Design a protein with these regions (language model features):
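Positively charged n-region of N-terminal signal peptides that target proteins for export
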Residues: 1-4
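Thiol-based oxidoreductase modules, predominantly thioredoxin-like and allied folds used
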Residues: 74-93
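Solvent-exposed loop/turn segments at secondary-structure junctions
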Residues: 53-56, 82-86, 117-119
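Bacterial signal peptide processing site
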Residues: 19-21
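Non-catalytic, surface beta->alpha helical segment in thiol-disulfide oxidoreductase systems
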Residues: 103-135
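Structural recognition of the beta-strand scaffold that forms the well-ordered cores
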Residues: 47-49, 76-80, 109-112
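C-terminal motif of bacterial Sec signal peptides marking the signal peptidase cleavage site
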Residues: 14-17
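Local sequence-structure signature of Cys/Sec-based thiol-disulfide redox active-site neighborhoods
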Residues: 36-74
Length: 135
């Protein structure tokens, strides 16, 4: 009986970890983590937005993202980019990311990957209102 209860208790914790990791908030990724996510064989759908610390529009956009996060069936990730980045590994990862997303012209930029693929109509640049994000 003790073994059964112990197994049930362990299963409960295991299954609890199967839900969204960060309920109600986007998950920050490094450029390298974004590349890993893009190469994920599961081909999950997710949204990625790119932002910066010194960007008023980005700060306001994060509030909009937090409003819609609970209403989305997919994970939302974000990448904070420093335009003056000097780390060569990060620069290389950002360049590789831009092969998939295209050149990032302005911040914030939003990309919706449907089953691992990015369609041109799923790339948006600049601040978006809540209604535009949920289309």
């Amino acid at each position: 009986m003790k073994k059964v209860l112990l197994c049930l208790f362990c299963m409960m914790f295991f299954l609890q970890g199967c839900g969204k990791d960060h309920e109600g908030e986007p998950i920050e990724l490094t450029p390298q983590e974004v590349l890993v996510r893009l190469q994920d064989p599961k081909k999950n759908s997710f949204m990625l937005y790119i932002t910066s610390d010194n960007c008023y529009s980005c700060d306001e956009y994060e509030k909009v993202i937090q409003e819609i996060e609970e209403k989305t069936p997919f994970e939302i990730y974000y990448l904070k980019m420093d335009t003056n980045e000097e780390d060569t590994d990060i620069k290389q990862a950002v360049e590789e990311l831009q092969i998939t997303t295209g050149k990032i012209q302005s911040l914030p930029s939003t990309f919706y990957f449907y089953q691992g693929s990015l369609l041109p109509e799923n790339s948006k640049e600049g601040y978006l209102e809540k209604k535009d994000l949920l289309k």
